[in-house]
Amino acid sequence: LRKDRNFLDAYVALGRIVSAEGVALDRNTRTWLAEAEDAYRNAEKIDGENQDVLWYWAQSYAMAGELGIAREKLQDILTFGRGKWITEALAEVDRLQKAERSAPGSKAGIKIGLKSEITRAEWAVLLVEELMLPKLLRKRGHADSPTALPADWPPDIENSWANTWIREILLVGLVGLEVYPDGNFYPDNTLTRAQYAQANQAILILLSGDQSLRHSYMGQESRFPDLRADNYAYNALALCLERGLLKIADRRTGAVNPEGPVSGADALLAIREFQNSFRVEY
């Protein structure tokens, strides 16, 4: 039995390694997924009800963009009703369902949509690839922001994989997704809910032309126990919550958690909300 368990763990490890390397090295998805499936099937032959096998198999399918099949593997875990991965499987099913509903249209969108936390660079990529914001604004007659940039591009985006997308967004000039006072963009920093809300507020104003949105919630008592009404991001967070672009962080306390992260699926759902609200056509 110990020998079988060692073999099972080895097969699971192989499936995980093949999947991680496949994504990191940008190998053909079908090729690395087939190799990972072989490893998991070998593990399954040893113990078909092992939750580690099902969990990591689901993760590999999700990494390959096979969200429906990934969800089926997670449902197999949930049928047990108990076990080490039950709580995680419930959360993962919810995340995958969000990603499926958001229906990303680009390869980058699919990859970013599966992340539990996205970076400032990844948010810029989604705004260009999924919302097509620069193209949309040009079509509506908006010129690039003359005050969006300092004299030079931020030095820390020069070697970023998202350099091109970040430059496009910087030309738009979104508050919350702009250059910091020290001249850097910090592309790899986690996007905070406050920054995300500020950028969404700026997009709402650009698409609607309603400048009053900047101060719609100013002067009122705070709706959130963890954020003062005079905070720089208060108006944007309140606006995004009311417009369905953001959800409350803690339903029990009502906390908004301005410094918390944003998931890729939630970001994509917000983009779909923009497209539906403004009947976006390209």
Where are these regions (language model features)?
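Repeat-mediated protein-protein interaction surfaces in helical alpha-solenoids
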Residues: 36-40
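Glycine-centered, phosphate/nucleic-acid-interacting loop/turn motifs that mediate DNA/RNA or nucleotide
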Residues: 173, 244
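Feature responds to low-complexity, polar/acidic, surface-exposed segments characteristic
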Residues: 2, 20-23, 27-31, 42-45, ...
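Residue-level recognition of tetratricopeptide repeat
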Residues: 7, 50, 84-86
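Canonical tetratricopeptide repeat
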Residues: 13, 56, 89-92
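Residue signature of alpha-solenoid helical repeat architecture, marking inter-repeat boundaries
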Residues: 5, 10-12, 48
